[in-house]
Design a protein with these regions (language model features):
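N-terminal leader/auxiliary helical segments
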Residues: 1-90, 94-261
Length: 261
């Protein structure tokens, strides 16, 4: 997954390019669209420090072809009490898929080439984008657009087989909590956070999500390439969103997973 800021920024860039009517519908349900931008990553944050069926679902979904989720999502939208609300979440998810499927093949290849971890490569890209946008990666709270509520959890939960409304709400709240924990501007807090994650067996994952005080030189090349891929994914996402909103058949793009293949 390109990390939190990249998906957030990407979703805003794509939204600005959509036809007026569709954009207006999504703006009415912007919070759901914004949560959808993080795709199955949302489930990672359910009781994040312990492995469980809900957060493992996030990993499982990343390895599935896009058609698996988006075929199910169509049925969920059709049966939803508020179809526009459900569609807004699904179209945010399309954005996530477009960026992931475009970037992940390169990220995995660069992991093998450089030895830098997957999460660190993506977090370094996040940080590069924030610096480009005049933001401080150490201080900017990247999950400020996530607005947990039971009403939104009721819309989102049906998209995930076997996941309850309570679990979905807990995952949303967990996303906020984890990002607060990882916003380690103070060097002492940073040490405490990373040491605690090492004890919990989550060091590699969490270390990659904590912003480095200085850019990692090994990630300069990857950040430049990922920005190129990001730009190519924008028109792809616009097209896929328009097609999905018009209920057109899923194209060949959905044969790709959210991951490398």
């Amino acid at each position: 997954m390109p990390s939190t800021y990249a998906h957030r920024r990407f979703g805003a860039d794509v939204l600005a390019l959509l036809p007026d009517g569709l954009r207006a519908t999504l703006e009415q349900h912007r919070e759901l669209y914004d949560i959808g931008l993080h795709g199955p990553d949302l489930m990672f944050y359910y009781k994040a420090l312990q492995s469980n069926p809900v957060n493992r679902l996030g990993n499982t979904m990343h390895e599935q072809k896009g058609e698996v989720f988006f075929t199910r999502a169509r049925t969920v939208v059709e049966n939803a009490p508020d179809k526009d609300a459900a569609l807004a979440y699904a179209l945010g998810f399309v954005c996530h898929f477009a960026l992931d499927s475009t970037c992940h093949p390169y990220v995995e290849a660069y992991v093998r080439e450089s030895g830098v971890g997957h999460c660190e490569i993506e977090t370094e890209f996040d940080n590069a984008l924030m610096r480009e946008d005049g933001l401080d990666p150490i201080k900017f709270f990247t999950a400020s657009h996530i607005k947990p509520s039971r009403e939104r959890a009721e819309v989102i939960a049906p998209f995930y087989e076997g996941v309850t409304v309570d679990e979905t709400l807990a995952a949303m709240k967990g996303m906020i909590t984890v990002h607060h924990l990882l916003q380690a501007a103070n060097p002492i807090k940073r040490w405490v956070v990373l040491t605690g994650r090492r004890v919990a067996g989550k060091y590699e994952f969490m270390h990659g999500l904590v912003a480095n005080p200085q850019p990692n030189p090994k990630c300069v090349q990857s950040s430049q390439k990922l920005e190129e891929l990001y730009k190519t994914a924008v028109p792809l996402a616009v097209r896929l969103i328009e097609e999905y909103a018009e209920n057109k058949p899923l194209g060949a793009e959905y044969q790709h997973t959210f991951g490398e293949n």
